[in-house]
Amino acid sequence: MTRDQNGTWEMESNDNFEGYMKALDIDFATRKIAVALTQTKIIEQDGDKFKTKTNSTFRNYDLDFTVGVEFDEYTKGLDNRNVKTLIIWEGDALVCVQKGEKENRGWKQWVEGDKLYLELTCGDQVCRQVFKKK
């Protein structure tokens, strides 16, 4: 594994995305559209500073952060909630905790070879996504 997550990453698989969205109380119609989409992630990393874009034909989401610095995040276009977000390194993986009205919410992201792995968690639901470097 490596801490270098720079690059453009195209989605290969998206396991249990609907279960994850249900745990976030995302409506039925939005879930049905979202599970059919393929996402592209663009990550610009300078040490512990990240600029990320998650793009699809339905919605885009930008997130800029510095590892180890808690910040207020509004999950616009996702579940539209305000959360306190902290992202840290655990080994070569980024681990995010999002504190708010949903319990056990966050994600873990790491790179192995030419693959980016992302596990999204909310409550007892885990979505596993795999992206390939473009």
UniProtKB/Swiss-Prot annotation:
<keyword id="KW-0963">Cytoplasm</keyword>
<keyword id="KW-0813">Transport</keyword>
<protein>
    <recommendedName>
        <fullName>Retinol-binding protein 2</fullName>
    </recommendedName>
</protein>
<keyword id="KW-0683">Retinol-binding</keyword>
<dbReference type="GO" id="GO:0005829">
    <property type="term" value="C:cytosol"/>
</dbReference>
<feature type="binding site">
    <location>
        <position position="109"/>
    </location>
    <ligand>
        <name>all-trans-retinol</name>
    </ligand>
</feature>
<dbReference type="InterPro" id="IPR012674">
    <property type="entry name" value="Calycin"/>
</dbReference>
<comment type="function">
    <text>Intracellular transport of retinol.</text>
</comment>
<dbReference type="GO" id="GO:0016918">
    <property type="term" value="F:retinal binding"/>
</dbReference>
<dbReference type="InterPro" id="IPR000566">
    <property type="entry name" value="Lipocln_cytosolic_FA-bd_dom"/>
</dbReference>
<dbReference type="GO" id="GO:0015908">
    <property type="term" value="P:fatty acid transport"/>
</dbReference>
<feature type="binding site">
    <location>
        <position position="41"/>
    </location>
    <ligand>
        <name>all-trans-retinol</name>
    </ligand>
</feature>
<comment type="similarity">
    <text>Belongs to the calycin superfamily. Fatty-acid binding protein (FABP) family.</text>
</comment>
<dbReference type="InterPro" id="IPR031259">
    <property type="entry name" value="ILBP"/>
</dbReference>
<dbReference type="InterPro" id="IPR000463">
    <property type="entry name" value="Fatty_acid-bd"/>
</dbReference>
<dbReference type="Pfam" id="PF00061">
    <property type="entry name" value="Lipocalin"/>
</dbReference>
<dbReference type="GO" id="GO:0019841">
    <property type="term" value="F:retinol binding"/>
</dbReference>
<dbReference type="GO" id="GO:0005634">
    <property type="term" value="C:nucleus"/>
</dbReference>
<dbReference type="GO" id="GO:0005504">
    <property type="term" value="F:fatty acid binding"/>
</dbReference>
<keyword id="KW-0845">Vitamin A</keyword>
